[in-house]
Amino acid sequence: MKFSAVILAAGKGTRMYSNMPKVLHTLAGKPMVKHVIDTCTGLGAQNIHLVYGHGGDQMQAALAEEPVNWVLQAEQLGTGHAVDQASPQFEDDEKILVLYGDVPLISSETIESLLDAQPKGGIALLTVVLDNPTGYGRIVRKNGPVVAIVEQKDANEEQKLIKEINTGVMVATGGDLKRWLAGLNNDNAQGEYYLTDVIAAAHDEGNAVEAVHPVSPIEVEGVNDRAQLARLERAFQAAQAKKLLEQGVMLRDPARFDLRGELQCGLDVEIDVNVIIEGNVSLGDNVVIGAGCVLKDCEIDDNTIVRPYSVIEGATVGEQCTVGPFTRLRPGAEMRNDSHVGNFVEVKNARIGEGSKANHLTYLGDAEIGQRTNIGAGTITCNYDGANKFKTIIGNDVFVGSDSQLVAPLTIADGATIGAGTTLTKDVAEGELVITRAKERKVTGWQRPVKKK
């Protein structure tokens, strides 16, 4: 189905009390307007015309990679004026879909229904019935068909009783829409060029206006303040949690789970409370994620346990591993099968071999660790000299004692032992014991100093 979209995103968002354009405020980890753009691209829009105004530099920086045509609305003179700024780029025979950057939850299913419903030469309009329609434009019908939309400030008392309201989302053919936009005037209570006036223009020409309802009313809720944004965030998260539960994922409390990206899960996955998923995350069968964890762009294989309050980003974790609690796996971290990292361990750009362990208070950066190696508490790979990074290579079956500093670059061969408290600066051969601990000294009868009175 050939169509192009116009996304209106020029408003400042005064009630957000922010220096950032309203549509750049995030929902589920990405700007509201990007949700709308992604929906359009997913449906195969030929062109996406993004009408912007306030905070143009911020908008273009934040959305620099998006496939949009930038259309400036220098003065905000109404929705009709906004769409008209993009109209020179409309093809006469293409469907034009009008959407809003601050209405982020509009679904593909609803848009497809709207595109299908557009009558030849007429308009398909998305409407919804509200118990309290105050503030919205009212849908005026005459013996059934839609004949006009009247904004709240221009409505008479009878029209204010109408509960069917305009969402602003509509579809019309490019040539018709350009003609109707050219005929708009600003003779109304707000002195603006209303897009809604094209409904009456279409009716006056004898063209049909078809009203369509969204799959869910939440889809057409807009955001004008942070309370409304928070409401949509919770609605979105509830929907994501419901889908995961239906797919067999055990969410211990669906109300305390946030998905800000894409999550793929195997069978019998358990996720405890206050877990945040960002980017693309993959969890294998029987994976258990403890409370308060943050997972971003990572892969965790079967039968692995991630204990509470661990942060995993850009890392891969093998099968039968244990992570945490309070572990940080940074980009480039790789845990092979049956490896363990424990509390207050940080791993960056390092591989931990099969069966190896670093259970306490350790930093492993720019390192390769072989199989069945034990890293004692307080071990640090000293990988940075203030200008360059250097690598530490540790072989199989190595024992590194507690409170050791491994000053890279260096290699520790298979089976070596590093005594506790060692500062290591040179390579260690296979099977060697290295210890640099200072000689122990005992002072008999030592008396601690006392405070002066």
UniProtKB/Swiss-Prot annotation:
The active site is at H360. It catalyses: alpha-D-glucosamine 1-phosphate + acetyl-CoA = N-acetyl-alpha-D-glucosamine 1-phosphate + CoA + H(+); N-acetyl-alpha-D-glucosamine 1-phosphate + UTP + H(+) = UDP-N-acetyl-alpha-D-glucosamine + diphosphate. UDP-N-acetyl-alpha-D-glucosamine binds at residues 8-11, 22, 73, 78-79, 100-102, 137, 151, 166, 224, 330, 348, 363, 374. GO terms for biological process: cell morphogenesis; cell wall organization; lipid A biosynthetic process; peptidoglycan biosynthetic process; regulation of cell shape; UDP-N-acetylglucosamine biosynthetic process. Residues 227-247 are annotated as: Linker. The keyword Thylakoid does not apply. InterPro entries: Bifunctional_GlmU (IPR005882), GlmU-like (IPR050065), GlmU_C_LbH (IPR038009), Hexapep (IPR001451), Hexapep_transf_CS (IPR018357), MobA-like_NTP_Trfase (IPR025877), Nucleotide-diphossugar_trans (IPR029044), Trimer_LpxA-like_sf (IPR011004). Its EC number is 2.7.7.23, 2.3.1.157. One of its GO terms (cellular component) is cytoplasm. Residues 1-226 are annotated as: Pyrophosphorylase. Acetyl-CoA binds at A377, N383, Y384, S402, A420, R437. CDD domains: GT2_GlmU_N_bac (cd02540), LbH_GlmU_C (cd03353). It is found in: Cytoplasm. Its main location: cytoplasm. The keyword Cytoplasm applies. Keywords: Acyltransferase, Cell shape, Cell wall biogenesis/degradation, Cytoplasm, Magnesium, Metal-binding, Multifunctional enzyme, Nucleotidyltransferase, Peptidoglycan synthesis, Repeat, Transferase. PANTHER family: BIFUNCTIONAL PROTEIN GLMU (PTHR43584:SF3), NUCLEOTIDYL TRANSFERASE (PTHR43584). Homotrimer. This is Bifunctional protein GlmU. It comes from Vibrio vulnificus (strain CMCP6).
